[in-house]
A protein has these predicted regions:
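Internal, charge-rich low-complexity segments
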Residues: 9-33, 203-229, 331-348
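Terminal amphipathic helices with adjacent charged low-complexity linkers/tails
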Residues: 132-148, 193-232
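Conserved short alpha-helical segments that host acidic/polar catalytic motifs at enzyme active sites
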Residues: 1-121, 127-189, 194-195
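Flexible loop/turn segments at secondary-structure boundaries
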Residues: 76, 85-87, 106-108, 134-135, ...
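Gly-rich Lys/Arg/Thr-decorated short loops/hinges at beta-loop-alpha junctions or inter-strand turns
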Residues: 37, 149-162, 244, 248-258, ...
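Extended, hydrophobic alpha-helical segments in both membrane/secreted and soluble proteins
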Residues: 1, 191, 198-205, 209, ...
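PRPP-dependent phosphoribosyltransferase catalytic core
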Residues: 42, 57-58, 73-75, 80, ...
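Phosphate/ATP-binding catalytic cores across multiple sugar-kinase/actin-like superfamilies
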Residues: 60-63, 166-187, 200, 205-208, ...
Length: 348
């Protein structure tokens, strides 16, 4: 759309108008105090409160955002939406104030501990006065806790402590469904992941299956009702979860943000497989994906490539919640019918 109709442009116009009103308020106060000329200008610079500007501006805006800005007088501000859709973390001491959308960036850059970094709460703003004072002010009342799940699942750095544990848990929770699909035949099932960002969820899935296998070993030993022989014990302990690096991504490309016609052509050349990694016609192949959006790569490339290994069964699982609605996280996905979940529902 034309630039003048974009949300950022409208927000800047509204904020500029409110800033003018804040300057006007201080101008009147300065005159009432008997100040003139340069003294009025200095008074305005020292008394403009960005929290007043934000309170009157941001109440009219909807959706997820972290807005950052700088005024001509040196006031800096960062504000998070009251629904908590977009993430924001900050660190401040006597020398620096810094804000980012992800905690690991701050930890790595400034060698900080997890506990050193604060989350900017929904509806709050981090303000840096022109004199260097940094404060956090409540601008709008919190209206919910609706963190963007797609950002946490796909875009966020997997090195974040919370994100890492979440992704592992999402993978582990798939254990019962996968067991049912493979008829509990772990001995003839190989586990792998696609794409590379699904690796953490893959470890979670493996953890779930390792727990299951260990429980089965304990039950088999207890069922003997006696001390097992060396051969029996060796047979029981031989059961394990098989994992392989089956798929290899040749180029670092994300097909879901590629333009329509180029997307299908690109998807067919993204992956290759490790030949000989499974027993043809004998092994099931379980592949975990961390986010299936349109399913373009899945349909155009992955399933065809995996089939070259001749597995007994291919099981595709996704650790992500279903992506059901357009314009998710602002990505250009305007049509509902593009989504893999929508197409699968219609097919069923």
């Amino acid at each position: 759309c034309p630039r003048i109709y974009s949300d950022s442009y409208i927000m800047m116009e509204a904020m500029g108008h409110r800033l003018d009103r804040e300057v006007e308020r201080n101008f009147v106060e300065a005159q009432q105090k008997g100040l003139e000329n340069d003294a009025i200008t200095e008074y305005i610079d020292q008394h403009v409160l960005m929290e007043n500007v934000l309170k009157t501006t941001m109440a009219d805006f909807d959706g997820g955002y972290v807005v950052c800005g700088l005024t001509g007088s040196g006031e800096m501000f960062s504000m998070r939406d009251p629904w908590g859709i977009r993430p924001a973390f900050y660190y401040k001491n006597d020398e620096i104030v810094i804000l980012a959308s992800e905690r690991p960036v701050l930890q790595t850059t400034f060698d900080l501990e997890y506990e050193d970094i604060q989350e900017l709460q929904p509806g709050c703003a981090l303000l840096v006065r022109s004199n260097g004072e940094a404060v956090v002010k409540r601008i709008l009342e919190q209206r919910g806790d609706y963190a963007c799940s797609f950002e946490r699942i796909y875009f966020s750095r997997g090195s974040d402590q919370d994100i890492y544990n979440e992704r592992k848990k999402l993978g582990e929770q798939l254990t019962p469904q996968v067991l049912k699909t493979i008829d509990n035949d772990i001995a003839h099932t190989v586990f792998s992941f696609i794409p590379n960002t699904a690796e953490v969820a893959f470890y979670g899935l493996l953890r779930g299956f390792k727990h299951y296998v260990n429980e089965q070993k304990i039950k088999r030993i207890e069922a003997l009702g006696r001390i097992p022989t060396h051969t029996e014990l060796e047979d029981i302990l031989h059961d394990y979860v098989r994992s392989e690096k089956v798929a290899w991504k040749d180029i670092k490309l994300r097909t879901f943000i590629t333009e329509g016609n180029a997307r299908n052509d690109l998807a067919a050349h993204v992956y290759d497989v490790a030949y000989g990694s499974i027993q043809p016609g004998v092994d099931n192949l379980v592949i975990i994906d961390d986010s299936i959006v349109r399913g373009t790569t899945l349909k155009e490339s992955i399933l065809h490539i995996l089939d070259r290994l001749h597995p007994k069964k291919i099981v595709m699982v996704s650790s992500a919640p279903q992506i059901r609605y357009p314009d998710y996280y602002g990505i250009d996905m305007p049509r509902l019918e593009e989504f893999c979940v929508f197409q699968a529902t219609v097919a069923l």
